[in-house]
Amino acid sequence: MAYSYSEKKRIRKDFGKRPQVLDIPFLLSTQLKSFKKFLVPDADGDHGLEAAFRSVFPIKSYSGNSELQYVSYRIGEPVFDVKECQIRGVTYSAPLRVKLRLVVMDKEAPGTVKDIKEQEVYMGEIPLMTDTGTFVINGTERVIVSQLHRSPGVFFDNDRGKTHSSGKVLYNARVIPYRGSWLDFEFDAKDNLYVRIDRRRKLPASIILRALEYSSEDILGIFFDNTTFEVTDGKVLMELVPSRLRGETAAFDIKSEDGEVFVESGRRVTARHIKNIEKKGIKQLEVPHEYIIGRVLAKNYVDESTGEVVANANDELTLELMAELVKAGHTKIDTLYINEVDSGAYMSNTLNIDSSSSRLEALVEIYRMMRPGEPPTKDAAEALFQNLFFSEERYDLSTVGRMKFNSRVGYDTDTGPGTLSKEDIVSVMKVLIAIRNGVGDVDDIDHLGNRRIRSVGEMAENQFRVGLVRVERAVRERLSLGDLDAIMPQDLINAKPISAAVKEFFGSSQLSQFMDQNNPLSEVTHKRRISALGPGGLTRERAGFEVRDVHVTHYGRVCPIETPEGPNIGLINSLSTYARTNDYGFLETPYRKVVDGVVTDEVDYLSAIEEGQFVIAQANSNLTETNEFVDELIPCRHKGESTFMGRMDQQYMDVSPQQVISVAAALIPFLEHDDANRALMGSNMQRQAVPTLKADKPLVGTGIELTLAKDSGVTIVAKRGGEVMYCDASRIVVNVHEEERVPGEAGIDIYNLTKYTRSNQNTCINQKPTCMVGEPVTRGDVLADGPSTDLGDLALGQNLRVAFMPWNGYNFEDSILLSERVVEEDRLTTIHIQELQCIARDTKLGSEEITADIPNVGESALGKLDESGVVYIGAEVKSGDILVGKVTPKGETQLTPEEKLLRAIFGEKASDVKDSSLRVPNSVTGTVIDVQVFTRDGVEKDKRALEVEEMQLRDAKKDFNEEFRILEAGVLDRARKLLIAAGFDEDKLALLNAEKLLTQSLAEEDKQAELEQLAAQYDELKAEYDKKFENKRRKITQGDDLAPGVLKIVKVYLAVKRCIQPGDKMAGRHGNKGVISTIVPVEDMPYDDKGRTVDIVLNPLGVPSRMNIGQILETHMGLAARGIGERIEEMMKEQRELHELRAFIKQAYEIGESRQVVDIDSFTDDEIRRLAENLKGGLPIATPAFDGAKENEIKDMLELAGYPRSGQVTLYDGRTGDQFERQVTVGYMYMLKLNHLVDDKMHARSTGSYSLVTQQPLGGKAQFGGQRFGEMEVWALEAYGAAYTLQEMLTVKSDDVNGRTKMYKNIVDGNHKMEPGMPESFNVLLKEIRSLGINIELEEN
């Protein structure tokens, strides 16, 4: 493979064996595609805003004389860009403008149009998605998590014998629409069929059929076959259908007309008997009279002569009834064919319990069930039933639901109306009865063919439709009220309900979540998350084991490893690496097509439904050079089972071994050697890693690090190829290659870097360039690293030298022993940025003021504030320091005589304000790195606000000038080249300014035209930049739009540097987590023969029981990788010949039998030098999951690095110098510092707030709460007999109010006694008992 210039800086050695047929798709595409589908108008109107508008419009007035029609919509430009929105705390959104047409009909002449008015109407703001798939809502980045919900359609299920005490299996069917009422059919223990609507009380199922205009006769005709009997001359003949006799016991001799007996009475009829009967061609059979008695009639019988009904359908036949029928002239009698085995009498029985006899009665019955207590009228009952399943406004199956419905009940087409039809309801009942009869299976609701993904776009569309429907009602009212001649569309529409619905969804829906921004991985994983919770989904409490379990259809679609531990396990999942959603919202995964035993490179995406029909080989099946299977029998999957089949039976093959797992799990090297429980912890803990000060690429990775860092959007990736012409810490400028330019543009790309900003988790986001001026750049190259990336590779932690051995009990129970060197080198130091804000409001007593003049505060406390009362940038502050001085007016208080006297003398009114300054919270120390001041429109800006504004303007001006200068240089450069080619003197041209340069005249017309084009381009550029700057200036100087009652907001940003310390939590990538117990001086750490100490000591007992052996293999491989780097460093120090260095690097890349080809010979000398420089710290290695390095490859690497093949080393005790008695596994492991820092958790309460009712101290660090002295702690003190301590704990230290105050007074007076009284919680208990009506009184003894 050919590497670009920047990829050659450091190449990761890959141990993957399988060729990569398909690159990992863009990781955020689910989110971006879904939202694009929502915003971009689509011609069919199937989805997005277009679909919402078309479903609600046109809105007709009640009279029908006017209607409001929808024409089109457009989305305007956002006012602020993403960064400005984050700083100002506003939503990144754009206005939605809709073109509407009001059509008014002529009342006098119906059908003629009187007036048409068209107008563009504002319909609120629509939040926009950023390039990285997030939304900025009120200044914070949020992610809308996709939801996995039950697909609309029809489902057949059974209760597995749990409902009825007899254990009988009861079957049920449920029609779930996308919106509208649910329709359930269910059997009871007596085999009657019932219907429920919206889970209300059940009615016999025949009621809904009657309401659909079916008579009893029709119903029996639909659900039963008939058996016809003919009664002639006292004989009863049955029309014979031989196959129906099978399995029955003959109640009489079955014989032909000539007397040949086929089956004797009492014998069971077998298939052989039936064959003989069919061969004979017998059509009728004489049966005894008893055989027909008890049969059920299939239709109504009427006496033709009198017109009276002799018998009704579903009546049971008796001898008397039979005689009457014959008398009335009915010699042929149709009865229902009922058979216990495969054709039960369910509908017949149901009709017997159904009390209704006409359509109206059925409708009334349904109305009573839906609206109990309301008097039913014919029209109301009719309208209610019509609206339930047959009205487009109230009921929609959606295209997905219709497709699923049709395929399940066996229709030929995929499409159809969104509402139900009579036939649909009958089909569902037919399938349910067939399943009860033993034909067909019930559905598996956990199958991914029955669960679909609902992404951002779809949820936003639903929410938007809700808003539109609210508006629709109001528009109808207004259309029928007003004088339509004077009204415009704008007067009819109120945008408030729409923007309220959208805002509510983005701001407070359960699926709109605060983005997890610890590191790039946590961002990507959050956007790829799939939740079964949320509106219309499951709840934690109701979700059983089956829903949470890994299902066979998860393969390649949902990761079986990555899911949270705890109550949400299995309900929140992650998308697999290659998975995507199809048009219907079902998850698909790619497979390579196999033709006649040869695996092709053609890739098909299959959904869970399609996959079941095929035979699919695993990705690790052995293939020959020509892509044929090596083995005769191949492990494969077919119809949800794992099995072995022949090579010619294979139809598809997995694309990649990593296809099964999610991105986070694919980052774990040697995953195949870890137990799944630990791998789960590993993938979850990588998301909690805090970006370290200096990112360090993992020595042992999996090869997916680069893709993930690029796709996450934290790095800066080149949009087009070119050459770096300028580069500093905040900007990179690339001069684009001629062939990649758009004709007529300057051809310069400017990338601005993000510097030291705060993430959602208070970690630090900072980008640093990785390129230098003059370097060539290819499209897709990484130009700048973000947090937790190193030369474009994801780098969540640090490579530390680890030894597995016990060390004086300091690594007991997963504790971790760390060397002081790690602290000194700042290997695990992180920067955290906190935002504190001070708000000045308008109160009833007057407005709050931000000032440095604060009552009762000494000079020293104000030392870090400027004259406006705001802390200066760069100040180092600790807890309790004032950051922003603020005073609040306080109500008039009763003055003491002394104060009155002072007032009278000095006339001062200053004491009627109280100090409400913003102070640094407890246990925080840091440096102020930024201050932002926001002032309400119309409020005068203070000095500090003006300074901030001036600085922002200065920076903006400088930025724009630099950008303009760069682009100008590009244009002028091309103009000079043009003029020089035309014979102008280069030196003279250098003296000309832009104006003169571009107004030269040339002899050749085409050249002149080109120069004029450049001049026009230059003018355009200048105008554009002037406009841009003016825009920016306006945004900076205008007042801010603050919440009602807020005059000013000051935001202060503190940066805190946190070194690693005992109590911090660390982890590897294999679920091996622990807390640092102590940090040991370097000289006391174990060291090897060369005197190199280890950085970290882990307990070997943590490995065997947890079965995460991957960490041991990683340690060995890390040692080899580092060793090879050290050898390269030695060669460079000794200044060896370049060809030796080249040969060694080549040898390192050629170890093992991998797919990777690195053509070291084609590298230039400079490239080799640069590569070697970057490999000094160790040769980075990729060992992909399920396709990684084998044991002997690790041993070969160790050998090349000059280490023993065992990977074990002799160590010496740092304190005594004695050798440890056996060799120790030493190597390099990638360790992460997790965002569970002791600084954030350590807390002690002195005096603080109490709970209002119980008067006990509050709990938790945020409330400055106390530690709960619980039940078990009380037992412990009881066991020690420490009565006084216990009394103190339960009274004065907790909720004895009088005792507390007395105790305080005593301490102040130096009288160390305590007088415990009655705890307040006893009073609460008394009140609670009294509330039950039991009076308790305490008596003094």
From Swiss-Prot:
Belongs to the RNA polymerase beta chain family. Its EC number is 2.7.7.6. One of its GO terms (molecular function) is ribonucleoside binding. The RNAP catalytic core consists of 2 alpha, 1 beta, 1 beta' and 1 omega subunit. When a sigma factor is associated with the core the holoenzyme is formed, which can initiate transcription. It comes from the Bacteria. InterPro entries: DNA-dir_RNA_pol_bsu_ext_1_sf, DNA-dir_RNA_pol_bsu_external_1, DNA-dir_RNA_pol_su2, DNA-dir_RNAP_su2_dom, DNA-dir_RNAP_su2_hyb_sf, RNA_pol_bsu_bac, RNA_pol_bsu_CS, RNA_pol_bsu_protrusion. It holds the Pfam family RNA_pol_Rpb2_3. It catalyses: RNA(n) + a ribonucleoside 5'-triphosphate = RNA(n+1) + diphosphate. This is DNA-directed RNA polymerase subunit beta. DNA-dependent RNA polymerase catalyzes the transcription of DNA into RNA using the four ribonucleoside triphosphates as substrates. Keywords: DNA-directed RNA polymerase, Nucleotidyltransferase, Transcription, Transferase. One of its GO terms (cellular component) is DNA-directed RNA polymerase complex. GO terms for biological process: DNA-templated transcription. It is an enzyme of class 2 (transferase).
